[in-house]
Structures are given as C-alpha cells and as structure tokens.
Curated annotation (Swiss-Prot):
Phenotype on disruption: No visible phenotype. Viable and fertile but their response to environmental cues such as temperature, humidity and odorants is impaired. Response of ac4 coeloconic sensilla neurons to agonist phenylethylamine and of ac2 sensilla neurons to agonist 1,4-diaminobutane is abolished. Response of dorsal organ cool cells to changes in temperature is abolished and consequently larvae fail to avoid cool temperatures. Response of sacculus neurons to changes in humidity is also abolished and consequently larvae fail to move towards their preferred humidity.
Tissue and organ expression note: In the antenna, detected in neurons of the arista and also detected in sacculus neurons which innervate the first and second chambers (at protein level). Throughout the main body of the antenna, expressed in neurons which innervate the coeloconic class of olfactory sensilla (at protein level). Expressed in multiple cells of the dorsal organ including the dorsal organ cool cells (at protein level). Detected in femur and retina. Expressed in a subset of femur chordonotal neurons and antennal Johnston's Organ neurons.
Gene Ontology molecular function, alphabetical: coreceptor activity; glutamate receptor activity; ligand-gated monoatomic ion channel activity; transmitter-gated monoatomic ion channel activity involved in regulation of postsynaptic membrane potential
Role this protein plays: Integral part of various neural sensory systems in the antenna that provide the neural basis for the response to environmental changes in temperature (thermosensation), humidity (hygrosensation) and odor detection. Required for odor-evoked electrophysiological responses in multiple neuron classes in the antenna and is likely to function as part of an olfactory receptor complex with Ir76a and Ir76b. Together with Ir21a and Ir93a, mediates the response of the larval dorsal organ cool cells, a trio of cool-responsive neurons, to cooling and is required for cool avoidance behavior.
Residues spanning the signal sequence: 1-30
Sequence ranges on the Cytoplasmic membrane side: 584-641, 880-947
SUPFAM superfamilies in the cross-refs: Periplasmic binding protein-like I, Periplasmic binding protein-like II, Voltage-gated potassium channels
Extracellular compartment segments: 31-562, 663-858
Protein name in UniProt: Ionotropic receptor 25a
Membrane-traversing stretches: 563-583, 642-662, 859-879
Membrane topology (UniProt): Multi-pass membrane protein
Gene name of the encoded protein: Ir25a
The species this protein was found in: Drosophila melanogaster
Coarse class of the protein's main subcellular location: membrane
PANTHER family: IONOTROPIC GLUTAMATE RECEPTOR
C-alpha cells in the first residue's frame, strides 16, 4: 500500500479530470464534424494550387473549430491529351461511386486549354457541382458557355490573380493614351484568351507574344522584330527572373525617351538587372494591411511559402471557402439528399441529372477571413458570375531607375486595384507622364512643290503645305515624327506581278507609318493601304506647255527687213539722189541751166546735191517730195524712185503688220483632244506616275473593247439575223487613248519632274513637248515660272489624302484631326499661304491676247526716232546760231580805200579780198560778176560784197 501526499493526490485528481474533459470534448467534436468528399483536379505545374490545398487540409485538422473533415482525391491533369485526362477523371469518379464516396465538389485549378476544357466538359455533362479557378472571362470557357439557369448556380468560376493582373495593362494604355504596345509574358501568366479581349475597343496596335526561352540572342531578335513593327511601348508580364532576362536583352538605345518599358509581376521582390541606364514602370502586388498577420501566420505555421505569395494565398482562400460552402449547405439542409450521380459510361449526351442546387448563393455568403485580399463575387443572380468574379488586391506602381546594374531609386507613384476596367490611382501625374514613350511616327514622302519642299533651315529639313498640315495634326493627336524621302521617288504603283514600289511598299512592309505628299487616292492602293479623309480638293490631270512668246523689241520696225535689204535701200537712195543731181546739172533743160525760161514759174527749185537728197527722202513719205525736176531725164529718175518707194513702203507695211500680229494669231493646243489630233508636239507623263497609269489603262480598255468588237464581228457562228443586229456597230470604239499611249512611248516618258520641265522649256517650233501631270504640280510651276502655262481642263480627278498602314489606328485619329482643321478653316489658310502668298511666286507679265493692241515694247522705237530727230535738230540749230554769230563778216570800206583796191584789181581780176571783188572794167568784169553772183545770193543783203 502506497501512502500519498494529500497535495500529490490533489494534483493527480486534477489531471484525471482534465483528461476526462478532453476526451469528452473530442467525442463531442467528432459528433459535430462534417465530412465532405472533394475531387481535386490540378495541372502538373500548378504548384501554388497543390501546396495551398495541402495547407488547407492541415489547417482544418489543426483548427477543429471548423468541424470539417475533407476526404480529398487528387488528379494531376496533363495539358496535351484530353482523352487520357478524361479517362483518368472518369476512373477516379467511377471508383468514388463504387465506394459510395461520391464527391460533393469538384475543385478545379486547371489553368486553360485542353486540361481546363476537358474538366469543364466532364462536370457540365454529369452535372457535378464545381468551383473552378481557371483563366478566362465571360465566354472564354467554351464548355461553360450558354449554361442554363440551374447549371449557372453550381458551375462556378473565380478568376485567379494571374488572370486579372494583365488587366492592369489595359488601364495603363487608357490612362497614358498608348497607341502601340508589345506584351511579352512567361509561363506564370496565361494569355491565350487575351489576344482579342485585353485591348478590345481601344485604338492601340498591339502584339502579345511569349518571351523567347532559347537564349539571350533569341530574345534580342524577338525584340528587334517587335521594333520592326514600329512598337515603342513594351510590357513584360512574368517573374522577376523573366523580367531581368528581358531587360538584359534590350539594346541600350531602346531605353531612350521614345521608348517605354513596363514590368508587371505577381512576385513581391525587387528587380535586379545589369542595365547601365534604364527607367521603367514596375508593378507588383501588395497585401492589404489587415491581412498581413494572417498571411504571416500561414507562412510560418503552416508553411504556405510557395511563390508567388499572391497565388498561394488565393488558392488557399478559394479552397477553404469552397469547403466551408459545402459544409454549410450540408448542415443547413440545402444539399439535396437524393443527389443522382451519373457514371461516364452512362452519359448519352442529353441525360444530365437535373440539380436543384444553389452553390453560388452559399459560396458568396461565406464570411471566412481571407489572407491577401477580399473576394469580389457577383451576388446578383441576374448577372453572370463566371468571368466576373475574382479576388481584389492592390498593385503598387513604382518608377524604377536602374543605374550601374542596381536599382538606385524606386518611387511609388500610385496603385491599381484589381478589377475589370479598373482605373489607375496616380499620386504623381508628372512622374507618370515621364514614363510615357514619346510617340514618334516614321513618315516617307516624295518632294513635290508646294506640298513637300526641301529646306535645310526648317526643323525637319522640309517645308510645304503637307508639312504644315502634319504639324497641325501632330498638335491635335500629340505625336512627333521623322521624315525622309522614299528612295525611288514614287508614291506607289503596282507592276504586272502585283509588286508595289514607292511609299505604298514602305507602308505594306511596315517600314513607314505615314505616307505624306500629293498622293492620290486610287482603288488599287486602297486594297493594300488605308487613306484618311481627303485634305485637298479633287485634283485631275492637266497639260503643261511652254508659254508662247514673240521676242519684243523697241526697234521692231527695223527687224521687218533684213540688214542686207536695208543696206540695198540705203544704197539705192544715195545712188538715185546723186544721179538726179547729175542729170539736173548737165541737162540743158534743167532749171539751173534755163533760169530765164522758167523765171515766171512759181516753183523755182534748183536740184543741187542737197536738194536731191531731200527730194528722195521726202518722196518715201506720205508728204511727198515736192516739185519734180524740170528736165525730162530728171523726171524719169524721180518717177523710177517713186515706183521703187511705193513697192518698198507697201512691202514694209505689210511685213510690219504681220510681225506684230502673227505670234498672237497662232492656234495653240487648248485641250487633250487638240493634243491627241496633232503630231507636231510630243507629249508624255512622268514614268510611274498616276497619270501614266491612267493613260496606260485607258489604252488597255480600248484594246479590250476592240477585241470584243472583233470577236463579235468575225464570229462565223452568228446567224444572219444576229449579224444584221450588229450591223450598226461597225467600229464604235474610240482609239484615242491607244494612239496617245503609243505617242507617249515614242516620246519617252520623263523620269522626274525636273526632266519634264526641262523638256518643256527646251521646246522649239519644230520639236515641241507637252507634259501631262497632276494639276496642282503644274499650276504651281506656272505660278513660279513665267515661261510655263496650263493648257485645257482637268480630267480624271482624284482627291489627295494621307496614307497609313492598312488597319492602322492613325486613320481614325487623323480623320478626326483633319475634320477639325476643316471646320476651323485651317486648310483654307494653308492654301492661301502656299498658293497665293508664297515667296517663290513669280511676277509675270500679262500674256498677250489677240484683242490687245500693239504694246509699247514693240512700237516704242518710233518714239526714240522722234526724240533722236528732235535732238539732232536742236544741235543743228545751235550750230547755225553759232555760225551766224561768230563767222567772219565782209567789211565795209570808204571811197579812198575802194580806189586803191580798184587799182590793185587790175592786176588780180575776179579776186575777192575782204569782201571786195577785185576786177576790171569791160566785158571780163561783167562775166566775172555773172559767174559769182549765185555764190553771193546766199548772204543776207546787209553782208553782200560790193563789186
């Protein structure tokens, strides 16, 4: 017998009581514990889901307060063979039926693709209550589309965080107005179903592609290909390791201001990279403060450490919530007692068991605390649950600057709360703008004044109507651009093999974003590229020719006759004048030799040499020469001169009139028909231009109609009646364009506009050339050059528009901008600037018209003749006055001097000394007086010498 200490006995009694109490509690708990059967289907590589479900089971065992025991059967689903997976599921399900352990719930954590759709098909066909964490929004789960109302209550889907996080890209694109984007993702995200829905109804050109896994070189090539698609906004969805690999594969030049990089991850760490200079936007999840303690407990106590924490916490909370939902339904009596379970082999396509099971209602009402974020579940029965339910959490937005291979600065500038169409919450808008890539578009153009002209002093090296237009559009749409000329100088034409050149080819090859210039909208171009609304009026083809001009001359009247003719006329004038003087001097019947005979005539005209010159000159004028010589021989000479002068004057007058009017009477080419009918002037458009295409196609169309006519006319199978009906159709098809196209080919099409202008300017009367081209180009050349003119009316009119890539978002943006400028009359101001106020416009003389009179440029020489004649007369007057005033006059002598001189005259008869005639008396003296008298008649009476 053992004696106990009373104190020891008391302790033993207390321990026994506690043991009994514990056993009683366990027995009570065992009686209230709810057992449920769950079939867990998970993909092979979805470790966070597998680990989370395992932790849930441990968590429930250690927390008996839940009163829940889960009998879990697991299936690892392969992602490539639906048949194998379906057999595995059916076998597991059949076994549970045999054991009478049919699953209350199918917990599906397959992600997407074959595995997910196989599970959805299985559960939908057999009517099994399912809670799925598969990826996809409404309509993405093909096997769960168009569910009836009953199935919508027990086939539920909650989107995992990795399916919600890509929606942040949509929010960023909208907030920052991004027009292009490349989205690279790794295996931690599933994007197959996001291609159409992610940026739907947003004017953002984007590419979604998986990150190249082969190596750094492959990733570099991948990024280079994306750059060739003219993308400068990059989004990286992946683990921190994947983000680092991509960043280290990027060329340093791609971190400049015209590029933007965004890294988005499910992990909570920091980015490490060997980049020397990079600034990126970094988004990572951030647990709500109120849940951090619970998450820490799960990580430390229950070993919920699988990365990423966000996914692990989601799967944990989803599994726990799902199990508690089944428990609540079972204990509340909401679970049907006569659940029918159909084996896979018994399913015949339309015998799915009918369920009266509202799993959705109980699932949304569970109030169990979460470990990372709350569940945002659709509670309204009228709204779809699947594709709209998810876990709500925050993503922190950071500006991350990497210098020298490490993050030197990380600043939080906002946050994004997970959701569909959730907006960014930005704290620092200025920093957010700095993360935006400068939108720079590549423009290719063709120099064509006044639309595009080179100017080294201009900001972009070019000026013109289109440069001003694109600058106005850029101010509205907010972008920058680079501009360069296309190598071949062509807007774009398609050859016989369907190959394009010029700007069109650049746009098709994605080497250009915008085609700018005087580019016509053509049907075949619209097949491969897009055009904006027209920014200019309809422009057709017209004709440019050299302006006809006759050289003007002040002495035009002298050019009527050639120099040799003028010299001959002058020689005839002097010869006739000299001959008339000789005849008058030697003819015994002339006035000077018969003064007594003609002393009573009113006209006493002595034809000395001076008088003969005057007579012949005045005879050529309407005034006439005056009195003719008295002798017959002189009159014959005068008559001959008059006849000669009449013929010369008549010929001169006729030629002068012809010279002044013939240039204005030439019939010019006034239309395309006139050009086609003549053969003197060659004509052609630019090689490869739209005008060339027009004439070539018109020629081909005429040829096609000719072939049709020929086939009908020469068809021997036609009956006489049928042939008679075609009798009126002899040859109604015009060959106008066929002949014109042949003439153009013979004339050789110019390669450039400068060559065409040079050929027009070098045109002569024998080898003329006319250029056919766009009316705007030709009209501008006319405005800037006085030797060119526009001929005829425009034809084949087409609008000018800006070209963009087919399907480009720029089309709608530019359309809105152009319409805005049109409403503001800004386009009219540009026309005014470049067509009326341009400094390059030439000030040309008014072209001559047939109704205009003779210009001063051609007749002004006669006024010069008048002024020269009047000037010579004035000079002669001065000389006469001088001669009269300062010549040596005869002196007056007295009688004594006269007597002395008379004595001297005897020795020198007939000599004039100091105005006195020295002579002698008698017959000889009288004869001397008679001979010298005419000589002194020219002196005034006061100064006549004394005899």
């Amino acid at each position: 017998m053992i004696l106990m200490n009373p104190k020891t006995s008391k302790i033993l009694w207390l321990l026994g009581f506690l043991s009994l109490l514990s056993s009683f509690s366990l027995e009570i708990a065992a009686q209230t514990t709810q057992n449920i059967n769950v079939l867990f289907i998970n993909e092979v590589d979805n470790e966070p889901a597998a680990k989370a479900v395992e932790v849930v089971l441990t968590y429930l065992k250690k927390n008996i307060r839940y009163g829940l025991s889960v009998q879990l059967d697991s299936i690892e689903a392969n992602k490539s063979d639906a048949k194998v997976l379906l057999e595995a599921i059916c076998n597991k399900y059949a076994t549970s039926i045999e054991k009478k352990q049919t699953p209350h719930l199918i917990l599906d954590t397959t992600k997407s693709g074959i595995a997910s759709e196989t599970v959805k098909s299985f559960t939908q066909a057999l009517g099994l209550p399912t809670i799925s964490a598969s990826y996809g929004q409404q309509g993405d789960l093909r096997q769960w589309r168009d569910l009836d109302e009953a199935k919508q209550k027990y086939l539920l889907q909650v989107m995992p965080p990795a399916d919600i996080i890509p929606e942040a890209i949509r929010s960023i694109v909208i907030h920052m107005n991004i027009t292009n984007a490349a989205i690279l993702y790794d295996d931690s995200f599933v994007m197959d179903h996001k291609y159409k829905s992610l940026l739907q109804n947003i004017q953002t050109r984007h590419v979604i592609t998986a990150i190249a896994k082969d190596g750094k070189r492959e990733r570099e090539e991948q990024i280079e290909k994306l750059r060739n698609l003219d993308i400068n906004n990059f989004f990286i969805l992946g683990t921190l390791q994947s983000i680092r690999m991509v960043l280290e594969s990027v060329k340093p030049a791609y971190f400049e201001r015209n590029f933007a990089w965004h890294a988005i991850t499910q992990n909570e760490g920091e980015i490490s990279s060997q980049r020397d200079n990079a600034t990126i936007m970094f988004m990572k999840p951030m647990a709500y403060t109120q849940y951090r303690d619970r998450l820490g407990l799960l990580r430390t106590t229950y070993n919920l450490n699988e990365e990423p924490q966000l996914s692990s916490a989601f799967y944990f909370d989803l599994a726990l919530r799902s199990f508690l939902t089944i428990k609540e339904m079972l204990q509340s009596g909401a679970w049907p007692k006569d659940m029918e379970y159909l084996n896979c082999d018994d399913f015949q396509g339309g015998n799915t068991p009918q369920r009266n099971l509202d799993l959705r209602d109980y699932f949304t009402k569970i109030t169990e605390p979460t470990s990372y974020g709350t569940f945002d579940l659709v509670t309204q029965s009228t709204q779809p649950f699947n594709g709209h339910s998810f876990m709500k959490f925050e993503m922190d937005i950071n500006v991350l600057q990497i210098r020298g291979g490490s993050s030197v600065n990380s600043k939080s500038i906002g946050k994004w709360i997970s959701g569909l169409n959730s907006e960014l919450i930005v704290k620092d808008e200025e920093q957010m703008k700095n993360l935006t890539a400068d939108t720079v578009y590549r423009i290719f153009t063709v120099v064509q004044a006044p639309f595009i002209m080179r100017d080294e002093t201009a900001p972009k090296g070019y000026k013109g109507y289109c440069i001003d237009l694109i600058n106005e559009i850029a101010a509205i749409v907010h972008f920058d651009y680079t501009i360069q000329e296309v190598e071949d100088g062509k807007f774009g034409n398609m050859d016989e093999n369907g190959q394009w050149n010029g700007i069109v080819k650049k746009l098709m090859d994605k080497q250009a974003d915008i085609g700018l210039g005087s580019m016509s909208v053509m049907a075949e171009r619209e097949i491969v590229i897009d055009f904006t609304v027209p920014y200019y009026d309809l422009v057709g083809i017209t004709i440019m020719m050299q302006r006809p001009s006759s050289p003007s001359s002040l002495f035009k009247f002298l050019t009527v006759l050639e120099t040799n003719v003028w010299l001959c006329i002058l020689a005839a004038y002097f010869f006739t004048s000299f001959l008339m003087w000789i005849f008058d001097r030697w003819s015994p019947y002339s006035y000077q030799n018969n003064r007594e005979k003609y002393k009573d005539d009113e006209e006493k005209r002595e034809f000395n040499l001076k008088e003969c010159l005057w007579f012949c000159m005045t005879s050529l004028t309407p005034q006439g020469g005056g009195e003719a010589p008295k002798n017959l021989s002189g009159r014959l000479v005068a008559a001959t001169w008059w006849l000669f002068g009449f013929i010369i004057i008549a010929s001169y007058t006729a030629n002068l009139a012809a010279f002044l009017t013939v240039s204005r009477l030439d019939t010019p080419v006034e239309s395309l028909d006139d050009l086609a009918k003549q053969y003197k002037i060659l004509y052609a458009p630019l090689n490869g231009s739209s005008a060339m295409t027009y004439f070539e196609r018109m020629s081909n169309i005429e040829q096609m109609f000719y072939e049709i006519w020929k086939d009908l006319s020469l068809n021997d199978s036609l009956t006489a009646v049928e042939r008679s009906k075609l009798a009126v159709w002899d040859y109604p098809v015009s060959d106008k364009y066929t002949k014109m196209w042949q003439a153009m080919q013979e004339a050789k099409l110019p390669a450039t506009l400068d060559e065409a202008v040079a050929r027009v300017r070098n045109s002569t009367a024998a080898t003329g050339f006319a250029f056919l081209g766009d009316a705007t180009d030709i009209r501008y050349l006319q405005l800037t050059n006085c030797d060119l003119q526009v001929v005829g009316e425009e034809f084949s009119r087409k609008p000018y528009a800006i070209a963009v890539q087919q399907g480009s978002h720029l089309k709608d943006q530019f359309n809105n901008a152009i319409l805005t400028l049109l409403n503001k009359r800004q386009l009219e101001k540009l026309k005014e600037k470049w067509w009326k106020n341009d400094e390059a416009l030439a000030k040309c003389d008014k072209p001559e018209d047939q109704s205009d009179g003779i210009s001063i440029q051609n007749i002004g020489g006669v006024f010069i003749v008048i002024f020269v004649g009047i000037g010579m007369a004035c000079i002669t007057l001065v000389f006469e006055y001088w001669w009269y005033r300062y010549r040596k006059n005869p002196r007056i002598i007295d009688v004594a001097e006269a007597n002395a001189e008379r004595s001297n005259a005897a020795d020198h008869p007939g000599k004039l000394v100091d105005g006195v005639i020295l002579g002698h008396s008698g017959e000889k003296f009288e004869k001397s007086k008679a001979a010298l008298r005419p000589r002194f008649n020219q002196y005034p009476a006061t100064f006549k010498p004394r005899f």
